[in-house]
Amino acid sequence: MKKNLFILVALFGFIVSCTSNQQAVQTTMEPYAEGKPYTRWWWFASEIQNEDIKYQLEWLKENGFGGVEIAWVYPMRGDSTVKHPKWLSEEWAASVNYAKRTADSLGLGCDFTYGTLWPFNAFDLPDKYGTRSFYQKESPEDRTLTWDHPRKARIINHLDKEAFAYYAKQMDEGLKDAYKGSKSGIFVDSWEVETRHLWTEGYGEKFKERFGYEIEPLMDKLYQPGYEDVYYDYMTLMSDYVLYDFYKPFTDHAHTQGAFSRSQCGGAPADLLTAFMLVDVPETEAILYEPNYGRIPASAAALAGKDVVTSETFTCLYGWRKWGGKGPYQDEEQVADMRLIADALFANGTNQIIWHGMPYNKKGNGKNDNHFYASVHVGPDAYFKDQLKDFNDYMTRVSQYMRKGKVYSDVALYLPLEDSWMGVEYPDSLQMPWVWGEYELRYVFAPDYLAGYQPLWVNAKVLSEASFNEGTLKYGELAFSALAVDVEWLDIAALRQIVRLAKDGLPVIMAREPKQPGKNKSEEFGRLYGELMKLPNVSARRDDVLKQKPLLEGENLPDFWCRQDGELLYIFVANPAAKKLKYPLRYGQAFEDQGSVREVVVNTVAGPQSLQLNFRPNESLLLKVDKEGRVEVIDLGFTAKKI
């Protein structure tokens, strides 16, 4: 992350007085600086005791964790008789403040989920600030699984920055002292607001002003075949609301509190690459989102000049069951399976693990007391406790290497956002109870002809702000040798930028002839495409355009991620068994791997170097490449054992 993002107000060692008899230490330590895994820390509504807070934080420190994200949830098992402090009360805040000061004293980071569960909701939220669909005259007040369960709450309107401001004022009053000390992240989880027919006041007027026709008479046909162009226009405006009435205000507001934003933008009905670029720390999730998805937030971080890409990790490892019980094989998790997921994430750009997660428990209690239903169980009684410290140390080492220098870049790859909006719904085979729309971009991969390159996703906004000079496409600190566009649909605004850059000399792969999405078609689209394809530096064939050799060449290449640190390259190559992992994992899936070999060529600045990659079962490789072309395999020093 850019260095100036996390500069703190006071110098290391400056002591400030706080409530109670403890003191908070102001520190210049950057969040996530050491790369040690964090854990989500489930605080079930109850009487949280300081001695238990201290015990759990000390245990985390001893076991290789770097910090926590406190997440406030319902009473265990939904038991409304459990005594607990009122949400955001002074008594509630006292425990939070103690946790933050104790974390600071131990050198641990401390982030906060910005609310009780998700999406953001409030108990006394006025109707005008609540979320609603086109067909709802009032916002439903139907959230009950919250800290104050069964008290009903209302989800905020994520399309109205005034609604967020109202909500944030309440949250900041509760967290005002917890913001002191080391810099904390405030976290927003994946979208999880109902998106079908989503609406807000003034939407219809803005839509007509922008597109020249009324959307209201078409809302009941929005998801029907034949109305894809209308849905595309609806999503185009919806995206602007989501980006600039929610994600940008969320980040801007975090800065006013001396905090930073961390966000899973997954599931948002928006231009996802831009959404991830707007937050300070973009976050993916695995394995409810499969590891390939992580390349979107990783690309966003690289484009926006941010170093840290986090992942909520090991969620629903072996599957999901409804709230009220434990998931499949919960409390029996194999470290080797978890490593498979972690390595797949690293090979798609993640460089900071957030465990999901650890429940608050009294000292001496454990997984049969407080537990979260969709989570790996982290705690002194974890099934994998004997390997936990070593596993955390392994993930720390990889994370540290994957922070060195900057992201290596060679090919810019256009993200098929328009395809997803024109596709509307996933086929039944790809839908899940919580997934229906292609707008989520869950199943996008780089085309096979870019195997061995490290393509980063780009979009129309990036292209509009990029330039081509001195033989490269430049955006921020990144430089690309070529642009690949392999889509069925392409917005005319993006096509205009592609033509501009190609006329300046940018090599462009136009793998297919795209069509113009949206209800308002233009003859300009065809003319622009014709101009583009007449340019000598534009072709449908990769070999006519790409002069730069791929970083790796070979058959059936594993997934990898590369960082460039001056004249050195660090390439994390995931075990082939980690490629294209699917939800859910089979129990013990990692042990099905018997080891494998890949013969590859590493194309270095000094020339091609042949290399045999020997993958031991359930292990990945880290390569260091210097300017002379020497390739060193770095020992990552960890083998997961079967439990």
Language model features by range: what are they?
Residues 37-38, 49, 53-54, 67, ...:
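Carbohydrate-binding surfaces of carbohydrate-active enzymes
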Residues 19-30, 633, 638-642:
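Acidic, contiguous N-terminal accessory segments
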